[in-house]
Amino acid sequence: MRKLIICIFMVLGGCLLSFAQHPSLLFTQEEVNEMREGKGTVPAFDKTLSEVLSAADAALNSPISVPIPADGGGGVVHEQHKSNYYAMFHCGVAYQLTGDKKYARYVADMLEAYARLYPTLGFHPVSLSPVPGRLFWQTLNESVWLVHTAVAYDCIYHTLSAKQRTTIEKNLFAPMADFIMDGMGDNHANNKTFNKMHNHATWATAAVGMIGFAMNREDYVNKALYGSDETGKRGGFIRQMDYLFSPDGYFTEGAYYQRYAIWPFVIFAQCIENKLPELEIFSYRDSILSKALSTLIQLSYEGEFFHINDALLKGLSAQELVYAADILYNVHPSDKSLLSVANEYQHTYLPTIGGFRVARDIARGEAAPIVYRSSVFRDGRKGDEGGIAVIRSTDPK
């Protein structure tokens, strides 16, 4: 019995230690050290770091503005809140890369401003969505805001006092996560969305799970992984991986939306890998996320996705694909064709260990050609709901 108690204590202690470590969402402290040590050795990655620092410095040189929500997508206030999450993301990463606390202070100041604003907000005044947000006109944007901000918070966590963390978590992050999961007042449409098999739900689960990791809230992480009821039978990120992709990695909403959805899939998966490596998330369902990226590449021509359904002009250069290529190359570095995707179509890298290794291995001449092939990509969870066939000529003419 004593040995059993000690064993349980060691397992629980390991989980709690993993949750308490910062940074550990997009990168770990060891990976930050590797990127710092590699500075000056990979010019293409140095350019990425320079761009991050330039964006962070530009944020520092502008006054913090956290306006009361007033307009929809594209409006001045909407764009300000969108700009704010990018600014916090860049400053959080800049702090980790440089150790300069001016970047951490900027993030802290903005988070405290949001912590004062958020409790005063009802539903957004633009009532065009059945799932209205509070900061934004729809909850989807709120989820995207929280995904980026969770990374920033993770980056500066240890620079904050206990009082600052309590204020920010109590007045901003916890209420926002609860809202994304359940809505508020008489409108609980968010709960249905959170547990839905849909790309908006993937953003929602990623947001709640990532801020759960950053705040050391296992309850939020469990709801993100296994749905509101934590059973995995109704919703959650794991169920989304089961239901939204066919066995071939084809996304049920088509390539254009697969491009958008793969972003929260890979970024949250990276956080899960760092925080809960025992889940082996990148191996889940026969490495379904890697299959999803491979399928996206195959559903393109000269770097653009096939124009089917209601697809807009997007392709392998999209920022979502930069995330996917860099994160998944770091998981499967034997797939050297991903280096060609990055080199031929993207020309930019994530400020993460994956981005560093992609840029480094391209510089080493390790890229292999992208092999496009004739294929049938089945649709549906079991691959029995139709599909899309791609026939390619082997004649270069």
Indicate residue ranges for each PLM-predicted region.
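Aromatic-lined, polymer-binding surfaces characteristic
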Residues: 24-26, 30-61, 75-293
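Bacterial N-terminal signal peptides
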Residues: 6-15
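Positively charged n-region of N-terminal signal peptides that target proteins for export
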Residues: 1-4
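Boundary at the C-terminal end of the N-terminal hydrophobic targeting segment
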Residues: 18-20
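Carbohydrate-active enzyme catalytic cores, enriched for enzymes
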Residues: 215, 260-397
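Aromatic- and acidic-residue-enriched carbohydrate-binding clefts of CAZyme catalytic domains
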Residues: 68-75
